[in-house]
């Protein structure tokens, strides 16, 4: 990927956190390389923490609602700290992964989603929760770290109802 494209993607990803209409936020995310489905709502303060070139590792499917000040982490490492020298002894010090939010999920305000996590369809993540592992479909997960506290029973609509 050429340098200008990388810079453009970074600018788009950063601009998303400022107050713009939802449609413009979605457009900026798509321009940055994130896969965003239809009818998605992303509130102000959204942050995607990742290195340039990893934006494709975030997938947000159709009809997902993301509350204000949600952070999704795709990459995390100690940057220029001397801790970086420990990565050979402790490989887990650098984290790179994908985040996949399945259709009809709702992420509450201030939630943090860490790398290598899938949020199942029709799941709810409570406000302020820190999601460290997969959340199964039709679940409510809350807390730090987030734990499933309830399974949802959702009736499927038929064409006649």
Task: Annotate each language-model stretch with its function.
Residues 23-24, 55, 108, 126:
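Short, conserved clusters of charged catalytic residues that mark active-site
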Residues 1-34, 38-39, 63, 76-88, ...:
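Terminal amphipathic alpha-helical/low-complexity segments used for targeting or macromolecular assembly
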Residues 118-119, 125, 133:
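Cytosol-/stroma-facing membrane-proximal "stalk/adaptor" domains immediately downstream
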Residues 44-118, 144-145, 152-155, 159:
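Flexible, glycine/small-residue-enriched loop-and-beta-strand segment within the central core
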Residues 133-134, 145:
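Conserved functional loop/turn residues at catalytic and ligand-binding sites
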Residues 138-139:
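Extracellular disulfide-bonded cysteine-rich modules/repeats
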């Amino acid at each position: 990927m050429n340098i200008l494209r990388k810079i453009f993607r970074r600018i788009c990803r950063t601009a998303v956190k400022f107050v713009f209409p939802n449609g413009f936020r979605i457009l900026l995310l798509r321009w940055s390389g994130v896969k965003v489905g239809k009818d998605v709502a992303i509130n102000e303060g959204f942050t995607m923490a990742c290195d340039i070139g990893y934006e494709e590792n975030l997938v947000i499917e159709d009809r997902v609602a993301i509350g204000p000040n949600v952070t999704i982490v795709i990459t995390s490492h100690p940057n220029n700290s001397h801790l970086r020298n420990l990565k050979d002894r402790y490989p887990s010090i650098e984290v790179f992964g994908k985040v996949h939010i399945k259709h009809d999920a709702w992420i509450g305000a201030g939630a943090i989603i860490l790398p290598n996590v899938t949020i199942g369809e029709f799941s709810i993540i409570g406000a302020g929760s820190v999601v460290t592992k997969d959340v199964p479909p039709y679940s409510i997960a809350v807390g730090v770290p987030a734990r499933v506290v309830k399974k949802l029973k959702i009736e499927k609509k038929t064409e006649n109802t």
